[in-house]
A protein has these predicted regions:
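Long, charged N-terminal accessory/stalk domains
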Residues: 1-391
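Conserved, carboxylate-rich catalytic/transport cores that coordinate ions
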Residues: 1-8, 15-30, 34, 293-295, ...
Length: 754
């Protein structure tokens, strides 16, 4: 789980006479992540596409264009089918003619309808003007302009124009119609020239007759006819979609497979008579891979497991592990050219020695069990893990839901989150990202419900505490509390301490991962300087903080939270002082934890001097985890406020012993007894205890308030938990940048070969 699946570099070398059979077999196995040949070997060239590649590519483009026209998706497919070349020749051509013809007609109709809509938009000013369209054009001695503008400005411009002998202006609500008789010696289009400076915007006069209303009615009737015809064409296309969907989807799949197979030689190193193909496969699949090819072509190819990617102390990202020959197998020894030492590879097509095309990074196949796999989406949101580093998915699986559940901690909210997650997980099987987020949400909801039971809360009400922990189990209160009321303030302080301890543990794991990675990739020196130093500093500092050396200086609750009388009675009251000597100037003990911190700082300064200025990160990063307690109290406070407004809250006892209670059944008066305690104060009477109107308002407040708390739980608890994982945890060891495993093959969905 912490390491990706082991990958092996394999080579397939053989005669071109069997290349097509090898390609078909390898494609069917869907195992080989092919390494692209870069043309660097003398005497070897990238292969040429097989016969039919161009034809298949052209057909594939045609099929996808038809699918786009018909708006097909995977849900439109019928049962799987066999698609033959003859069917492609005949049926595809017929479908193409019908669909393209209908699509052309649809586009033509849509264009005509758009033109009519433009005409109708244009005719509106003329309807406002109220003059027949045939009266607005066709004159020999008059010029006409229609548009919008300021009438007084237009008339002033016309009055001052010597080139205009006479004019008349007609007006509608927003439209002006101007009829002008130019002088005998005036230039053509003189009216347009006069109106240029008159704040007038001209509108093109349509070439039509009759009133604007008649013209608009005629065009609307024409549009109705075209829309009816368009509906008919759409119905024919929908019918064509129903009839052709299964064939087109299956044809696309077959042609995609054909294109993959025929273009595969482009990645091979070839001569006139031989080929070499290389790539990565999961190591445990090599025997199956080898056997399948040998069954297909016999001994006319040489199949070798050239190397296995592993970790080592040679300073490289990954190195090659020699593969011992299998008894009876064809795997050969890896010569020095195939190692990761930069040796030159001698390219031979006779299988005499293994050949490495490229010292490429192995693809990363995350090796996580089913229940953990949805959390890969959170890791890949940052980056796919590199093959050389730990996959932190399992850690996110163990910590993210716990962080989230602890911060929300409510059975009601947990059930809702779990239901949402279950819905996403079960209804989006064809959308892996949504399905994975559903799995994450489901886990977060389960932990929220578990912590809600421990807190004794359901939608912010302490009903579980009352009826389960106090009524059935017989406890005085729930096993743990959030600490909102004055009587429970020690819990709130205790959660701050717990948050710090969680941060220390979480960061220890992160730097241990980094330590192991540096140890495997480099050496002990790198591991100690880059990660061991931080481990020493962080643990030294926080052991010192939790030791008696700071007693009387640090807050008392740091030492009392876990004492026998504390809220979490584990019997821990702090570490001993562990003094080594007294510092003369400040008269304070220099302790063993401080020495450990100092050693870590010196190691960091020697190994990574630039990072030494960030030594306080061991304090800051850990304190960042107190956001867990902060969000816990904030979310609890929001739910408490919503319930306070609806049910009301009364107080029993006073001062540091004061406890808050919701008025679920009724609101007692001050001075009366409730559950054996005197009511000392009413914080709020509660909308539910008022009139019918306040009850209605209260119901709205209750529903909307809890929905808001539910939504903000994602944006607060969810984002804060993710931030702790990404910023505090990942930054200590995770680089990412891994390559996705893309095997040569196809997962058939619409076709079958049988």
């Amino acid at each position: 789980m912490l390491r990706p699946e082991r990958m092996s570099k394999v080579s397939v070398t053989g005669s071109k006479a069997v290349m097509d059979d090898v390609v078909e077999t390898v494609h069917g196995l869907n195992l080989l992540d092919v390494t692209e040949y870069d043309g660097s070997w003398e005497g070897f060239d990238p292969g040429d596409p097989a016969a039919g590649a161009e034809e298949s590519s052209g057909r594939l483009v045609t099929v996808r264009a038809l699918e786009s026209i018909l708006d097909l998706d995977a849900n439109d497919a019928g049962p799987t089918r066999i698609v033959t070349d003859d069917a492609l020749d005949e049926e595809l051509s017929e479908i193409q003619d019908r669909v393209n013809g209908l699509d052309d007609r649809r586009k033509e109709l849509e264009s005509e309808i758009r033109a009519i809509d433009d005409d109708l938009d244009t005719i509106e000013p003329f309807r406002d003007l109220g003059i027949d369209l045939d009266l607005l054009s066709g004159y020999d001695t008059l010029e006409v302009a229609v548009g919008t503008g300021d009438r007084s400005a237009v008339e002033a411009a016309l009055d001052g124009a010597a080139a205009i002998d006479a004019y008349e202006v007609f007006t509608g609500s927003d439209t002006l119609g101007i009829f002008a008789r130019p002088a005998a010696d005036a230039d053509a289009d003189v009216l347009d020239d006069v109106l240029v400076g008159a704040n007038f915007t001209a509108i093109e006069i349509p070439d039509a007759e009759g009133s604007p209303e008649e013209y608009a009615d005629k065009r609307e009737h024409e549009r109705d006819r075209l829309e009816s015809e368009l509906d008919t064409v759409d119905a024919e296309l929908e019918s064509e979609k129903t009839d052709a969907a299964g064939f087109l989807l299956a044809a696309e799949e077959k042609l995609s497979i054909d294109v993959q197979r025929t273009e595969a030689p482009l990645s091979f190193a070839t001569t006139d008579n031989a080929f070499i193909a290389e790539g990565w496969i999961p190591s445990e699949e090599f025997l199956e891979f080898e056997a399948a090819i040998e069954d297909a072509v016999g001994e006319r190819v040489e199949i070798e497991e050239l190397e296995r990617a592993r970790f080592s102390a040679d300073g490289t990202d990954h190195v090659r592990e020699d593969v011992p020959a299998e008894p009876g197998g064809s795997g050969g020894e890896v010569g020095s050219p195939a190692a990761a030492d930069g040796g030159a590879a001698e390219a031979r097509a006779d299988g005499g020695s293994p050949v490495v095309m490229d010292d490429d990074e192995p693809p990363t196949v995350q090796d996580n069990p089913g229940v953990v796999k949805p959390f890969e989406v959170l890791v890949e949101a940052v980056s796919r893990p590199s093959y050389r580093e730990f996959d932190p998915t399992i850690v996110l699986f163990l910590t993210f839901p716990a962080f989230f559940g602890f911060m929300i901690g409510d059975l009601g909210y947990g059930i809702v989150y779990a239901a949402i997650g279950y819905f996403l997980y079960t209804n989006f099987e064809d959308r892996p990202a949504f399905r994975s987020m559903g799995g994450v949400t489901l886990a977060a909801g389960i932990f929220t419900a578990i912590f809600g039971i421990l807190y004794g809360e359901i939608f912010g009400l302490h009903l579980i505490a009352t009826y389960l922990w106090e009524g059935v189990v017989g406890l005085a209160h729930a096993p743990i509390e959030k600490g909102l009321s004055p009587a429970g303030v020690d819990w709130a302080r205790g959660w701050l301490v717990v948050s710090v301890l969680v941060g220390i543990f979480h960061l220890n794991v992160a730097w241990l991962f980094g330590f192991i990675e540096d140890l495997e990739l480099h050496d002990l020196e790198h591991a100690v300087y880059e990660n061991g130093s931080w481990l020493l500093m962080m643990n030294g500092l926080w052991v010192w903080v939790f030791s008696d050396a700071l007693a009387g200086v640090a807050p008392e609750f740091i030492y009392t939270t876990f004492t026998a009388d504390g809220v979490l009675p584990l019997g821990f009251a702090g570490f001993p002082t562990m003094a080594l000597f007294t510092i003369p100037v400040v008269d304070a003990p220099f302790t063993l934890p401080l020495l450990v911190f100092l050693i870590g700082f010196v190691l960091l300064a020697v190994g990574e001097p630039i990072e030494a200025i960030e030594f306080l990160n061991v304090l800051v990063n850990v304190l960042s985890y107190t956001r867990i307690a902060a969000v816990l109290l904030a979310k609890a406070g929001m739910a408490f406020t919503v319930n306070l407004l609806f049910f009301g809250v009364y107080v029993t006892e006073s001062g540091a012993d004061a406890e808050w209670h919701f008025g679920l059944g009724h609101m007692p008066e001050v001075g009366t007894m409730s559950s054996g305690h005197e009511v000392t104060e009413i914080l709020f009477g509660g909308l539910v205890h008022g009139s019918a109107a306040t009850i209605l308002v209260g119901v709205l407040v209750l529903v909307i308030g809890h929905l808001l708390v539910l939504a903000l739980g994602v944006t607060s608890a969810g984002l804060q938990a993710v931030r702790l994982e990404y910023v505090e945890f990942f930054n200590k060891f995770f680089d990412g940048g891994g390559r996705e495993y893309e095997p040569f093959g196809y997962d058939r969905q619409f076709t079958t070969e049988d």
